[in-house]
Amino acid sequence: MRFFALFIYRPVATILIAAAITLCGILGFRLLPVAPLPQVDFPVIMVSASLPGASPETMASSVATPLERSLGRIAGVNEMTSSSSLGSTRIILEFNFDRDINGAARDVQAAINAAQSLLPGGMPSRPTYRKANPSDAPIMILTLTSESWSQGKLYDFASTQLAQTIAQIDGVGDVDVGGSSLPAVRVGLNPQALFNQGVSLDEVREAIDSANVRRPQGAIEDSVHRWQIQTNDELKTAAEYQPLIIHYNNGAAVRLGDVASVTDSVQDVRNAGMTNAKPAILLMIRKLPEANIIQTVDGIRAKLPELRAMIPAAIDLQIAQDRSPTIRASLQEVEETLAISVALVILVVFLFLRSGRATLIPAVAVPVSLIGTFAAMYLCGFSLNNLSLMALTIATGFVVDDAIVVLENIARHLEAGMKPLQAALQGTREVGFTVISMSLSLVAVFLPLLLMGGLPGRLLREFAVTLSVAIGISLVVSLTLTPMMCGWMLKSSKPRTQPRKRGVGRLLVALQQGYGTSLKWVLNHTRLVGVVFLGTVALNIWLYIAIPKTFFPEQDTGVLMGGIQADQSISFQAMRGKLQDFMKIIRDDPAVNNVTGFTGGSRVNSGMMFITLKPRGERKETAQQIIDRLRVKQAKEPGARLFLMAVQDIRVGGRQANASYQYTLLSDSLAALREWEPKIRKALSALPQLADVNSDQQDNGAEMNLIYDRDTMSRLGIDVQAANSLLNNAFGQRQISTIYQPMNQYKVVMEVDPRYSQDISALEKMFVINRDGKAIPLSYFAQWRPANAPLSVNHQGLSAASTIAFNLPTGTSLSQATEAINRTMTQLGVPSTVRGSFSGTAQVFQQTMNSQLILIVAAIATVYIVLGILYESYVHPLTILSTLPSAGVGALLALELFNAPFSLIALIGIMLLIGIVKKNAIMMVDFALEAQRSGGLTPEQAIFQACLLRFRPIMMTTLAALFGALPLVLSGGDGSELRQPLGITIVGGLVMSQLLTLYTTPVVYLFFDRLRLRFSRKNSKPVVEI
């Protein structure tokens, strides 16, 4: 009592404490970073290696495997996957959450160094690594276009200057430049001219390499001067290479220009990039795993004026895609929802109290509690994101509850004629324990969330802590500021009922009287209520099993990603045409604002597209509806498919897939994997629960298999190395020399001129110079026949892997899709040599599904323990927790009604309901126990009186929580996909709980009281009088 009096009788100190909390919160708010969601990115490092011209199988066995064995020894690696394609290997390392990305990078570099001696010779550079997840959508895409500059020159400027500058910005993890390649001098050989002159391809290569050298020449000095020796030992342009003498034929010089076309071109001509309908160079910027997306984008935008100043006038630099506007719009929507919730909650209080002064008290308590929370969020390193702001929106109904309970009890004493300060002290003392019980038991709900591991635990931690801090501050405010304001602002009055006979007061009296009448009937028919209670428990179990489930609500971020997959034997020219066709289809859609794309590189039959949709206010359809519409349009394109998916703020795993969810097949036998993957993919494609089924296993590429006759080769004086060198020189875009420039290094690339390699007959024109100097045609010692070969080889760990990706059709949940896949795998009878498991987001969903019930049970158990300690009773916590089944039924029925699957957001709503609905029972039980102890009432009389006395605060707190969550249900615009499931769950649970617990709680109270008396009689011993 003295504790409460300290704040009631010292108003200045109390006001200053509240002001200090508010000021700290305002300062914290201004310093908090902004993000779409809490930081949940796994630390990911990508290792890249290249060996131009090497087949995917060669890259997998000679490059990927040695690196994997070395990298696999690093501590904290959660998953390691690799993909090897023509001349390229990429290994993705995903680390545990607690692994520091910089420390992991040092270990990766050490592992690369350890594997260096096992890697094949001829690699143009050592393997490199980047601290970025290649499967993440870029946070920003910049495009460079020009009417006068070539694509190679644009690419050179972008990679040499722009990418380097952008990479230095805080938060940037990787700047991937696409659309072309670095400039190079390309030597296109004429096989017939070489044969006529008797010049081998190796001779050409060696001549070029010998003519372009960069070696130190030293210096000459005398007693006075010193001269640095410099020679013209370097050739830098095509014009300088053309007159190069490569051979003498009967004393006549054979120059390079006589047997080849030499041009200033690019290293890899099989690359193309576009923005809308124009050729472009793309700078795809990804953030570091731990970086804040908004701060990183702001840093890039701040750098743009400097970048534009250094760009020549002939180049146009534009932002093709920016993730930040939709994130900011989403947060603005949440902030508006928060403001509406606060207004609605205060309106509810005013309607019940019908007094401006009385309403002002909780109207002050709410902002003080919410604003003060920002300070704690800043100290915890949190951000302003959708989940933390949603926590504050929901907290609006919670933080006002404590103030309402205290205010309502003080007002009751004032209405009885007690003096204000005395009423404030007496009223606070009476409900102080109740308020503490309500708040501590509510915070206890979130303790299991704080201990939850993995991605869900990281994702929900900020929500739980933010809400717990708001409740804690609210508890302090309700026991200090609220009674002080009541004591000094409210006035006592003589007992009268007139105010209750007007407007809302009259309705409340009528409701209370009707409730009293119905409660009497219920207390006389307790068995029927017991049956209803047990029915709600059973209905909970059935609804939870039956309701569709998913991991996280599908968001409309305004950005789509598209993966193009064409026939495996397609040429680059045809693939470029497919890219243009698909971009036109997308560009013509009225909901699309911008589209960029690229193709080429090591995977000729694939391409990527990034689509920016118009803002939500300018289009009627959701992102998924637009995808459904575009899926129909692009299905008419022959020889290729475009797989579209909406970019999400959460994406798990490092696999680059053409759909949102993945199912991975593993086997130690590559043959078994290649046999069963098509069967499984075909069966999954037929499932109505899946859409856009595709696979990264591409083992049907066109190959020309050359078979050497080794005996003939030996007789002709030719070895296998010379024959393989011939093929590499002719068709491998072989980088044979380096040109050193001040800003970068460029390559001299040699191959047969594309004019002479249009079909397989080009092999007939190839020849090898044997040991006797004679030109021996390739057809003399080799035969060739067409065959199929893989375009890529994939590993997970050290096992061969194939990932089947899929999207969800409209109206299908992830749980329905995973159940259908598991059922199909069982029906197919897949052998044990092929193992299947979900990966990425689908894998996390499976893990979350297994822990959801455990989490709910743990929350209930924690609340029981806290209540048991507070009440020093095993029984009363059970009475309070009996409110939960009705809330669960209401929440699940509401989700079914709105066709919303049970997601991680809905789980948060269930956890919140555990904390909300028990408040009604706490208020009933507290007053009933007090009435039994001090008033000498029977349990039936005590619980009946408690229900009637607490009817008004129960209605106030429930309606405050309901109206606080209602804006989440009704909200639209950006980010509404996250807010609505939470609001639906809470509103549905509150409505059902309010209808049932006003009757079931008294019945359960009496049941346990009778049970207690029965056990106490059994355990009591007769007293013997002496």
From Swiss-Prot:
Describe its membrane topology: Multi-pass membrane protein
Q: Which SUPFAM superfamilies match?
A: Multidrug efflux transporter AcrB pore domain, PN1, PN2, PC1 and PC2 subdomains (SSF82693), Multidrug efflux transporter AcrB TolC docking domain, DN and DC subdomains (SSF82714), Multidrug efflux transporter AcrB transmembrane domain (SSF82866)
One Pfam family it belongs to? ACR_tran
An example Gene Ontology CC term for this record: plasma membrane
Subcellular location per UniProt equals: Cell inner membrane
Supply the Gene3D superfamilies for this chain: Multidrug efflux transporter AcrB pore domain (3.30.70.1440), Multidrug efflux transporter AcrB pore domain like (3.30.70.1320), Multidrug efflux transporter AcrB TolC docking domain, DN and DC subdomains (3.30.2090.10), Multidrug efflux transporter AcrB transmembrane domain (1.20.1640.10)
* Source taxon at top rank: Bacteria
Regions crossing the membrane? 15-35, 333-353, 360-380, 387-407, 431-451, 463-483, 528-548, 853-873, 897-917, 953-973, 984-1004
UniProt-listed InterPro entries? AcrB_DN_DC_subdom, Acrflvin-R, Multidrug-R_MdtC
Q: Which GO terms describe its molecular function?
A: xenobiotic transmembrane transporter activity
Keywords (alphabetical) are:
Cell inner membrane, Cell membrane, Membrane, Transmembrane, Transmembrane helix, Transport
Q: What NCBIfam families does the entry give?
A: PRK10614.1, RND_permease_2
Q: Which HAMAP family match?
A: MdtC (MF_01424)
Give the quaternary structure: Part of a tripartite efflux system composed of MdtA, MdtB and MdtC. MdtC forms a heteromultimer with MdtB.
What's this protein's family per the entry?
Belongs to the resistance-nodulation-cell division (RND) (TC 2.A.6) family. MdtC subfamily.
The name of this protein is Multidrug resistance protein MdtC
Q: What is the lineage of its organism?
A: Bacteria, Pseudomonadati, Pseudomonadota, Gammaproteobacteria, Enterobacterales
